[in-house]
Curated annotation (Swiss-Prot):
Protein name (database record): Replication termination factor 2
Keywords: Chromosome, Phosphoprotein
GO BP field: cellular response to hydroxyurea; mitotic DNA replication termination; regulation of DNA stability
GN (gene name): Rtf2
Keyword Phosphoprotein appears in the UniProt entry: yes
Function: Replication termination factor which is a component of the elongating replisome. Required for ATR pathway signaling upon DNA damage and has a positive activity during DNA replication. Might function to facilitate fork pausing at replication fork barriers like the rDNA. May be globally required to stimulate ATR signaling after the fork stalls or encounters a lesion. Interacts with nascent DNA.
Species whose genome carries this gene: Mus musculus (Mouse)
Biased composition (Basic and acidic residues): 227-241
Residue ranges of the region described as Disordered: 193-296
Localization, UniProt: Chromosome
Complex and partners: Interacts with DDI2; probably also interacts with DDI1.
């Protein structure tokens, strides 16, 4: 039964029993929640933001998380409910004048007071170290202790004067029950926002359908009608064969819009038109452009102007 050296093992050393639950140091847990970022595990530094579940983050860490949503991140579950920068609120914190920070114990020969906090409640003066419940308002981001809101009941923020409702109050680092309640509110708020977006889309569609004339006019540039109105013609074939009036051509050129002739339009000769002789002399069909065989050059010296 004995081992080397005359030692005798006891029963609890040999028999395996159920594992004991590891006890977490409450002071260390409070320091981690109120002084370190939930996402990056770094010391909280301004600007400090809080999510809809009441967790504290560094704003830089949240932006980096949103830009790089890779599966390799170990702490992605802590911020999986944050989909955009609009889901977090920047906090307005009041500094604690009694907090010395790292300057108080530079040599390491003094006791560090873990209960001393960087921020306090601006109304009551309680330190934000986890011993007292704190909350913030979604509308403005001001942070107060829960005792201040209970003692001074008002529908207006004590610091900036912004109006708020009970749904805007979010508890910082609350219990499991508080987190479940805040999660339900968050889901209801997001569903309400989706329904509002869906109701807005049909309204815009009905407004556009009620005004068809304005949409057609705005779709393209306005067309200016030039010339005299066309007279009613019983026979459409005669209308195709007749040439276009001279006034309509001049008006079309003056308005700056040159339209293509229709497919069924007949080609007309410039020599038969009623233009002036100087205008006709430009074209090769004019009598001045025609040359006799004697005036034209032979096959060696011919140019393109001879034809």
């Amino acid at each position: 039964m004995g081992c080397d050296g005359g030692t005798i093992p006891k029963r609890h050393e040999l028999v395996k029993g159920p594992k004991k639950v590891e006890k977490v140091d409450k002071d260390a847990e409070l320091v981690a929640q109120w002084n370190y970022c939930t996402l990056s595990q770094e010391i909280l530094r301004r600007p400090i933001v809080a999510c809809e579940l009441g967790r504290l983050y560094n704003k830089d860490a949240v932006i980096e998380f949103l830009l790089d949503k890779s599966a390799e991140k170990a702490l992605g579950k802590a911020a999986s409910h944050i989909r955009s920068i609009k889901n977090v609120t920047e906090l307005r914190l009041s500094d604690n004048p009694a907090w010395e920070g790292d300057k108080g114990n530079t040599k390491g020969d003094k006791h560090d007071d873990l209960q001393r906090a960087r921020f306090i409640c601006p109304v009551v003066g309680l330190e934000m170290n986890g011993r007292h419940r704190f909350c913030f308002l979604r509308c403005c981001g001001c942070v107060f202790s829960e005792r201040a809101l209970k003692e001074i009941k008002a529908e207006v923020c004590h610091t900036c004067g912004a109006a708020f409702q009970e749904e805007d109050i979010i508890v910082l680092n609350g219990t499991k029950e508080d987190v479940e309640m805040l999660k339900k509110r968050m889901e209801e708020r997001r569903l309400r926002a989706k329904l509002e977006k869906k109701t807005k889309k049909p309204k815009t569609a009905t407004e556009c359908a009620s005004k068809p004339g304005t949409t057609q006019d705005s779709a393209g540039p306005s067309k200016v009608k030039s010339g005299k109105p066309e007279e009613a013609d019983p026979d459409p074939r005669e209308k195709k064969s007749t040439p276009a009036p001279r006034g309509a051509a001049t008006n079309g050129s003056a308005s700056g819009k040159v339209g293509k002739p229709p497919c069924g339009a007949l080609k007309r000769s410039i020599a038969d038109s009623e233009e002036s002789e100087t205008y006709k002399s430009i074209f090769t069909s004019h009598s001045s452009a025609k040359r006799s065989k004697e005036e034209s050059a032979h096959w060696v010296t011919h140019t393109s102007y001879c034809f």
